[in-house]
């Protein structure tokens, strides 16, 4: 079995609030059970288990579930399209380098998809080129929109043209979904919100 949709994070993240001078970034808080709580400006976002950052724990899960190969990509909240482009690019490099390290250590078990600072097409293209040429990734993961821009926005075309020239696949992942404030119950974000966001992105293209 090949699992195309798996997310991974580095075991540690840079203190981006301190480094950039503003908030909105994900940080970790260690929990007593060995998990990590993802926190944004002091507010809990999600708790992740060791298999989210520990490749050996992930390999044990793969053996249990009969998965031969995983395609690794970052957790979409890390896209950071809202941030200043240089800072988003710096974070993308950290995330992509970590994925590349995991793939290099277990090249028969993992492939990687990079992340790009999509709010700045020139930077996104540079990072896309690095992902393909230096890190050896087959492609990248991008969000279903970029700060409200649908993926058919003309400003984004150069990124897709570069992906075509580089023979890079593009995995579109839903994020920052529509009508979030109306979907707090009944698993509606996953049953309705994410599929709707994906459909909107696909139809835009």
What are these regions (language model features)?
Residues 1-205:
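Helix-coil boundary/capping segments in enzymes
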